[in-house]
Curated annotation (Swiss-Prot):
Its main location: nucleus. SUPFAM superfamilies: S-adenosyl-L-methionine-dependent methyltransferases. It comes from Trypanosoma cruzi (strain CL Brener). S-adenosyl-L-methionine binds at G130, D207. The keyword Ubl conjugation does not apply. It is an enzyme of class 2 (transferase). This is Cap-specific mRNA (nucleoside-2'-O-)-methyltransferase 1. Keywords: Methyltransferase, mRNA capping, mRNA processing, Nucleus, S-adenosyl-L-methionine, Transferase. It holds the Pfam family FtsJ.
Amino acid sequence: MSEVTDKTVEFLLRHSASRRPPDIGSLKEKAFERVNWRDAFDRFQETERLTLWETKSELDGVDEGAYRVARDALFPFAVSGSQGAVSFGNRAGHKLREVMEATGVWEHLQRETSGQKGAVVFADVCGGPGAFSQALFEMSRQYKLRMRGFGMTLRNVRGLDWYSSLPLGKFLPTYGIDGTGDIFNLANIEALLSLTIRERLKLVVADGGFNVPFNIANYQETLSGRILFGQWLAALKLLRPGGCFILKLFDTFSPLSRALLYLSTYLYDRVHVVKPRHSRVVNSERYLVCLGFLGTPGPWMEYFEHCYQVGFSDNDSIPKIMPTSWVMEDKTFMKDLKQMNSTIASNQTLALKMVLAKLQPS
C-alpha cells in the first residue's frame, strides 16, 4: 500500500483574469434559497468526497484510544501537547507558523509597515484561549515587528478564557456590544470595528470551530458554515488595505465553501490554501491565507451583511449566497480548486487507510 506523511502543502487560488467581478450587489433583493446542512452539497467532486466519507466511516466502530495510538505511531510529528510543539506549548502555534511561512505573510507585513512607526495591529477572532495570539507575539520578535492585538471569543465558556500569559498592554480581550463575544451577533463585530477603526490593523486570524459529534463528523464543513462566514465577514470589516487574513477551514467541497474561496480571489491580491505539517494528514483541516486586502465594494458589503443576518438565520440552514454558475464557469479557479481538493482528500484517505491497516490484528 502507498504511504503518506505529514508535510506542509500549499495551493494558490486564482480567478480568470478575463472575468469581471461578479455582480454581487444585484443579489440583495432576491430571497435566499436555504438547505439543511445535510443537503448542502452538490455533485462537485462527489466521488472524492464520498470516498473520503466512506473511509472515515470505517472508523466508526474503532476504539478511540486505539485509534489515537495507531495514528500517533504513524504520524508522530503532529502529536498533541509539548511533545510536538515545544516552542509554543501548543500545536496551533506551529500550524500558524507553518502557514505564514509557506505563504510569505511575515514578509508581506514587513513590506506593508516599512518606514512606519508603531506596532502592527492584529485581531484574533473566535480565538480563545489565545494560541494564535500567543504565537504571533512570539514569532514577531524573529521578524523584528512590534505587535498589538485585539481578541474576541465567547465569554464564560470553559476552555476559551484568554491565556493569562498574553502580554498586558499589548493584547485587549473584547466581548462586543452584548458582552457575549458571540460573532453571530453582527453588532459585536461592529463593536470590535469601532475599537480598531483608527488602528493600523493589518492581520486577522480566525481559528473558530466547535466539537462535532462523531456520527455526523462528515458534515463538519457545512455544520460550520455560519461561523466560517462570520469570521470571513469580520476580516472584511476589520482589515485595512494591504492586510492579511488567515482562516481555519475544513473540507471545501460545498457550494458555500467554493463561493467564499472564489470571492476571496477578488477581495485580496493573493489567495492560498495551506495544509500545514502540524495539521494531521488524517483530518480535513486546512487554512485559507489571503494577502493584500483590496477593500470591499459598498454593494458587496451590504449584501454580505444582509446574507449574514437573514441568510444564516439559524445553525441548521445554509443559504445559497451566489449563483453556482458564477463560480463553476471560471475555468482557472475551478482548476485550482479541484487540484487542492483532490490532493488533500487523497492524502487524507490514504492516511486513514494506513491507520485502519495498523489497527488490524497481526
